[in-house]
Amino acid sequence: MSLLVMLATIGACLPKPLSESGGGGGVNITLYGFSIMKEPLEKAIYPAFAAKAKREHNIDIHFTSSFAGSETVTNQILQGVKAQVAILSIERDADRLKQGGFVTSDWHLLPQQGIVNKTPFVILVHKGNPKSIHDFSDLAKPGIRLIHPDPISSGGAQWSILAMYGSELLKSKRDSGTEDRTRALQTLQAIWRNVISTPASAREARTTFELGNGDALITYELDGLLMRQGNPKADVEIVIPETTILSEHPAVVIDRNVSVVDRPVINAFMQYLWSDEAQREFVKFHFRSTTNEALNQENKELATIKYPFTVNDPLIGGWSRAYPEIIEAVFRDQVQKRK
């Protein structure tokens, strides 16, 4: 069903005074998202979708939203908040919502298998890069003070762990033809010994670093670009690791909280997220489009990654393997507990 047809269906579902005049308070969409989705949604995506509905069908669309670490958002929904849509940092959180009975539809049937945008993981350092940090492995050097979000509450933190561990696996395979999991583990252990603060979300970690704490921060590329954009004189440089992961972010409908009347509204908004108009807005906020590579070329600040990889790389195995085998068995059991 096209977006125009969906919007027309919305009008048909509304009481006539509302659909014809735009009065009566309009239609509300409640969205919960992981922390870095706040700016593009509130400043661009929401206003653009609402304007489209008003212009083409005289329907008033309003949004209510809340943003936190992906694990926190997922827990809030599981505990009963009435979110209708969630945009999450990691697919595992979407799986948790499905297992809890909150998501009954298959988000993989959405465009791009439900992945609405992506961004690589990078390292932020202070101007001049005084600690000579050029790759994840440099974060293992003695004396480095690393800010890192908390893997218990932050999906971004879990992406960061996969970035550090996975980059060593891929580098070792390029060096010797075989992945060296011992080397990857030892590097991750050495890096984690240098962590001095674990804020609850990627956005809180960025704030901690902005306030002058630590020598380095592992985060989404877009967060570094937003810092620089907000303050060109900010004490920050972006280090692009030669090998790093592209985080991919699923959008899901919380079916349990969507009424029959609201369904056309939600479906129209979900489809809109993958439109060129919305994808271009994500790119303006330094995400990368999942639908059209040409849109990514419009943002000249997006870095070229020499050896990008995703969670679905055979050495990582997708989230069904990455979480139990790397996040739990490697990080929690052999790194975090032994720090």
How should these model regions be labeled?
Residues 13-100, 109-110:
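Early extracytoplasmic/lumenal segment of secretory-pathway proteins
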Residues 80-86, 143-144, 211-219:
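Alpha-to-beta junction loops
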Residues 1-11:
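Bacterial N-terminal signal peptides
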Residues 173-240:
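Ligand-binding pocket segment of bilobal, Venus flytrap-like solute-binding proteins
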Residues 36-39, 70-73, 91-95, 128-131, ...:
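Solvent-exposed loop/turn segments at secondary-structure junctions
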Residues 256-339:
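Extracellular/periplasmic juxtamembrane helices and adjacent flexible linkers that interface
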